[in-house]
Amino acid sequence: SILLIHEIGFDNFTFKKLGFKIGSNESSIYRYFESKHKLLLYLSSWYWAWLEYQLVIETFSISESKAKLEKAIEVVTKTNTIDSDFSHINEVILYKIIVNESSKSFLTKEVDTENKEGYFEIYKRLITRLKEMILAIKPEYLFALSLASSILEGGLHQNFLNEHFPSITNCKDG
C-alpha cells in the first residue's frame, strides 16, 4: 500500500487498485482496514512509533539538556533514510507519504472520536517527549507543548515546501 499511495497519491488510492496491484481481491483488504482513511491512520501511527523509537535511541545517552533537545529536533525534522531494522517498511517512502498526506488522517470530522479511541496516542506522546526536553532547559516556559508540536509539524511542512515549493523555504534536502 505504501508504494501505491506514493505512486498515485492518497486521493487516487483505492483498495480495488491495491488489490489489483498485489493480485488479491478488494474484499480481502477490507478484512484488515474498513476504509483507506483507517489505513492512513495505521500508516501514520506506525511512522510516529518508528520516529519515537528513533528519538529515544538517539537521545537516551545524552545527559546535557540542551544537547538532548538539539539532537531530538534533528531526529524529528530530518529527511529519513532506510532503516535496515525494519525491512518490511520503506521508511523513505513512508516519510514522503507522511509529509504529503498525514494531515488527511486528522483533518476530518471524525478526529475527536478517533482521538478518544486512541488513534493519535503515539503522535501525542512524541510531542510530549519533546515538551519534556524543552522544559528540562527552561521549566518556566509556558508554551512548551505549542513549541513541541510546532517543531514536529513545522519540520513536515518545511519538507513539503522543499519538495513542492523550494523557492519559499530555506529547508534543503536532509
What positions do the PLM features span?
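Helix-turn-helix
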Residues: 11-38
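Hydrophobic alpha-helical connector segments
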Residues: 42, 57-92
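Amphipathic alpha-helical interaction segments
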Residues: 17, 68-71, 75, 146-153
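An amphipathic alpha-helix adjacent to DNA-recognition modules
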Residues: 2-3, 33-56
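A short secondary-structure junction motif
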Residues: 50, 54, 83, 101, ...
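Hydrophobic/aromatic-rich alpha-helical bundle segments in the mid-to-C-terminal region
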Residues: 116, 135-174
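Amphipathic alpha-helical packing segments from all-alpha helical-bundle domains
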Residues: 94-136
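Short, amphipathic alpha-helix enriched in basic
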Residues: 1-14
